[in-house]
Amino acid sequence: MDPKFQRVALSDGHFIPVLGFGTYAPEEVPKSKAMEATKIAIDAGFRHIDSAYFYKNEKEVGLAIRSKIADGTVKREDIFYTSKLWCTFHRPELVRPSLEDSLKNLQLDYVDLYIIHFPTALKPGVEIIPTDEHGKAIFDTVDICATWEAMEKCKDAGLAKSIGVSNFNRRQLEMILNKPGLKYKPVCNQVECHPYLNQGKLLEFCKSKGIVLVAYSALGSHREPEWVDQSAPVLLEDPLIGALAKKHQQTPALIALRYQLQRGIVVLAKSFTEKRIKENIQVFEFQLPSEDMKVIDSLNRNFRYVTADFAIGHPNYPFSDEY
């Protein structure tokens, strides 16, 4: 089997490709770029495509996937597509309609994975982040377990093959895992994860529960001022990662991606540049010896790029706990 298509088993029997293509881009990037980049990614060998309602690009990403099916490059079953339930749709009666909305935009019959994007419910409505007159996000009170039951129904209805979560801490995962009458446990927890925030404890916990950790911002994150502190260190400019890149004759990005794969993490690589998209899939062509893995481990400083400040103060804000 082509190493590019390496997959790992999820707890429900489905398989997820270990390397995924991330499609998020800042607001000012034209949505058409997501379509072009997704086509390039599929041509390069990516089979796992990650998007979300929040990214507002599912029409374009769906178009890219369908055009690659139409031209014979892939079949629908070759593609593993992830979408995410946004915070304004946590009320149980809104979960399925939100997924159906994504499917309509995608023009697909099902998603391979549907995940709760963030554990904090926001006031339902058309605004992505509803705010009061002081510019503060308006929270909603929804039991996360009730949202999860609605997710389970989406799986039973065949609209999502697998269901999972994102940005959950240990306590929030345990709330679902210990829920009376739990039908399906989350197959994954998609979180920010890179050498500066290596999530060692959360990874260990997830592995112990058969939950796959999926890494976003694996290359250190975009620099969008609304979401990321502009003084944040640039991961790919780290001298230790640079030295390892030189040693292995790879790019710093490939070192950061390879590090995650060797820890048993499913990793998302985000780039809209053709050259880099094609480079990133070369992550299967080399290995890091354990001493290099230890060097990268030593870079951990629990530094988070995506702090989701809009949700600070919400009872379910996930990043106040240690992990």
UniProtKB/Swiss-Prot annotation:
The keyword Cytoplasm applies. It is an enzyme of class 1 (oxidoreductase). The record marks K84 as: Lowers pKa of active site Tyr. NADP(+) binds at residues 23-24, 50, 166-167, 190, 216-221, 270-280. It catalyses: prostaglandin F2alpha + NADP(+) = prostaglandin E2 + NADPH + H(+); (17R,20S)-17,20-dihydroxypregn-4-en-3-one + NADP(+) = 17alpha-hydroxyprogesterone + NADPH + H(+); (17R,20S)-17,20-dihydroxypregn-4-en-3-one + NAD(+) = 17alpha-hydroxyprogesterone + NADH + H(+). The record marks F54 as: Required for substrate specificity. The keyword Acetylation does not apply. Changing F54V: 73% reduction in 20alpha-HSD activity; little effect on 3-alpha-HSD. Pfam families: Aldo_ket_red. Its main location: cytoplasm. GO terms for molecular function: 17-alpha,20-alpha-dihydroxypregn-4-en-3-one dehydrogenase [NAD(P)+] activity; prostaglandin E2 9-reductase activity. The active site is at Y55. Substrate binds at Y24, H117. Keywords: Cytoplasm, Fatty acid biosynthesis, Fatty acid metabolism, Lipid biosynthesis, Lipid metabolism, NADP, Oxidoreductase, Prostaglandin biosynthesis, Prostaglandin metabolism. Gene3D superfamilies: NADP-dependent oxidoreductase domain. It is found in: Cytoplasm. GO terms for biological process: prostaglandin biosynthetic process. GO terms for cellular component: cytoplasm. Its EC number is 1.1.1.189, 1.1.1.149. InterPro entries: AKR, AKR1C, Aldo/ket_reductase_CS, NADP_OxRdtase_dom, NADP_OxRdtase_dom_sf. Can convert prostaglandin E2 to prostaglandin F2-alpha. Belongs to the aldo/keto reductase family. This is Prostaglandin-E(2) 9-reductase. It comes from Oryctolagus cuniculus. The gene is AKR1C5.
